[in-house]
Amino acid sequence: MALTCRMRIPIPGYRGRPRRRKGLTGNGRFRRRSMRRRMKGGVLPFLIPLIAAAIGAVPGIASVALQASRKN
């Protein structure tokens, strides 16, 4: 990848920004164990974002239903 200035002239020898590799930091055993760890707080913290998203989607769903009923 060449670095380009505003006039799109490639600058030789520039390879771009170093990209971060995800998931390679830390110990693999620790990562696996942390994924299996039981969620703190039970099911409620998991459900709250889903309920909030459903409540936010209600007006959009209702408007689509109203438009569909008006066309028929």
From Swiss-Prot:
Domain of life: Viruses
Site (Cleavage): N27, G28, G42, V43
The protein's role, per its UniProt record: The role of the precursor might be to condense the viral prochromatin for encapsidation by virtue of the two basic domains.
Location, primary (coarse class): virion
Official protein name in the record: Late L2 mu core protein
Annotated family: Belongs to the adenoviridae pX family.
Keyword field contains DNA-binding: yes
Compartments, as annotated in UniProt: Virion
Any GO molecular function: DNA binding
GO cellular component: viral nucleocapsid
Propeptide positions: 2-27, 43-72
InterPro entries recorded: Adenovirus_late_L2_mu_core
Taxonomic path: Viruses, Varidnaviria, Bamfordvirae, Preplasmiviricota, Tectiliviricetes
Keyword field: DNA-binding, Late protein, Virion
